[in-house]
Amino acid sequence: SSSVPRQLPAPPRWFTGRTDHLAALDADLNHQGTAVISAIGGAGGIGKTWLALAWAHRHLDRVPDGQLFVDLRGSSPDGTPTEPAVVLRSFLDALGVLPDRIPSDLEARAALFRSLVAEKHMLILLDNAVDTAQVTPLLPGGDTCTVVVTSRHRLPGLVNAHGAHHLGLDVLTNV
């Protein structure tokens, strides 16, 4: 497929501080040969998404095959997180898969997604994850993609089972 998705929202207009956190994400990205997953955990409204977007926009040159972005609605007011199958349908669509070629089964969708991104250098930003089970089907199978996950929770399953680098975030203090 020749589709190159560019799904990142605009970078935060005013992003300040968090230099250490940006450096930590840089260090994660520089571990060649591993899928980089940074579970940025912390309370609501402290800048997880802004940090992820600010970092991502600084590294667009490292992901020439595009970016995929989704708000997983892990802390949505109506309490209904986005199902992985729905996310995979939108990712496959963005990658140029025709609607009638998208499998109905979650595992088949995940396998097709992994196949399509296996050799690509892409960024996959999974924002506002509720738990590891929601994220796992959305992970690439190879080591060429960079994955950044934000969540209000630590997601220990992502760290333990998938080698994610956890980056905790605290409220910024005035400097």
Language-model region placement:
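Walker A/P-loop phosphate-binding element recognition
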Residues: 1-127, 143-151, 162-173
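Conserved ATPase-coupling elements of RecA-like P-loop NTPase cores
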Residues: 129-137, 142, 158-161
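Short gly/pro/ser/thr-enriched loop/turn and capping motifs at secondary-structure boundaries
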Residues: 154-157, 175
